[in-house]
Amino acid sequence: MKKFNLLLFFLLVVVVFGSQGTLIFKGTDQYNLFLGRNLIDGRTLFIANTAIPEGFASLQVEQPTVKTAAVTNTFLRVTPQFLIHNFEPFKQKGWLQSVVPLYLRYRYDTLKPWLVLGFESEVSDNITGFINLDIPKDYRSYISHGDNFDSKPYMNFPVELFEGKLEALDMSWPTFGYVSYASNNFYASLGRYKVAWGPMRNGLTISDASSYYDNISSSYTTPLWKNGRFTYSFLVITPTSLLNEEEWVKQGKVWDLNQRRPYTEGAKTIIGHRFDVQFSTWGRLGVGELNVVGGKHPDLNDANPFIIFHNTYGEDFSNVMASLDLSLVPFKGIELYGEIAIDDVSFGSTEAGARGKPTALAYGGGLRYAMDIKGTLLLASVELYHTDTWMYNRWQPLLTFTNRIYTKSELPGSRDFTDYPLGFKYGSDLNGFSIMANAIMTNGLSISFVYEHFKQGEVTLKTPYLNMEEPEDDPGEFTAPEDWSGPVGETVNANILKLNMMIPYRNFTFGSDFSLYFGDYFKKNGGYEKPIFEIRPYLSYVF
């Protein structure tokens, strides 16, 4: 009966959407229910990528898909959210620069949009289209407290409109939308949404830390051996290729010993290939490869869906990373998993020399536990992380493993770049761990707790690669082999605690989140001597 209650709730969530093309995203209650149910049954997922289509999800849980009629459902969601916090205004202006600390951007990304107009189209049993017009609060009015840094925000609605300031109406939307086709064995989508690779909650190769990725994704899956599956995935991401004047100068220089000439077209493309081998219902191995092509538009040599590179030998315009991850379910309800991302390994003639690229790895592992308590799903995990000193970095701005997003603000006026790390959410040169617990009840009540801690050295993604300001420079500080693993220099500690609660009732959703930040990391990146907190209760209604 316990499993039946959990299964019933899971099916109710899925049936709302119907089409096999509807996508499920990591970190949502729907995904956690999907993941938890499989762990309770002693199964690992045959694909560790998200978004995952419901066609694949129905295959994973061995449930038939639901036939649907072609229809478009329109909704209008209004969400007033109130803000109680002791954050100081962030006063450093950015004009085509990445100056805002990542924790402040992540804080903004989780703020509810005050108005969402959505069109969800079930085109057929296999095709879903989703158009989402989400209007958020102006970015800088939230983190910088208005034009004069003295208008402390108290809600997500642009109250400055009542003062006649039409510029308070943020126009940096939308952040979500897609069209997707899926069956039980094939999936393809085009859109703007969160993407993630691997089993870790905070991924090291591609994480869902970015507010979105503009991407094309595709996968196919087939039975393998007696109880396994083989799944192949192809991905193309196109971050903004906007650079500021200083970055264009760096992009136009020859840095690499193997580089023949600079490539300076306004283009950056991230191409990913990955296969997952589920060798048994209790085990899965994933192998992936990412190729960042920058300064030129990719051709079929760069973006062939079925050619996987160790090295493109395109040092002028290419940066390649490999990944390996493993998931094991030795007992029902327990999952052991790990991931390693390999940017560079310094050995042999291709990497040797004083100005060769250093070894740069990111690796981590975790333990996940799921159980059903009288119809309530409890999902908990502990994860450990390490990123090397120069991970995700590169001389040429268009070859870093980052997803740049451009945000336009008017209160105060700013044109901000946010360079989200493609992998671990806080970047390079650190050790960290996290604890997560999520309880989801049959009435829809969801409570989650997350604690994250990391110790970071002096090298970040804003640090010039190998501390070289010019190509003729010798590598600077923290570039000797003994410094490659990090953290290096003067380290700082960060502690982030988050508590979220949400319960739906008919067309209403009631919820709140609480965040607490403390540690000398926030003194270095914000000047905070004492802990900082934020409480954000909200009420959402769907028309």
Features from the language model and the residues they span:
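Positively charged n-region of N-terminal signal peptides that target proteins for export
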Residues: 1-4
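Outer-membrane beta-barrel "beta-signal"
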Residues: 503-506, 530-543
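Hydrophobic h-region of N-terminal signal peptides that target proteins for export
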Residues: 10-18
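C-terminal structured domain segments
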Residues: 492-523
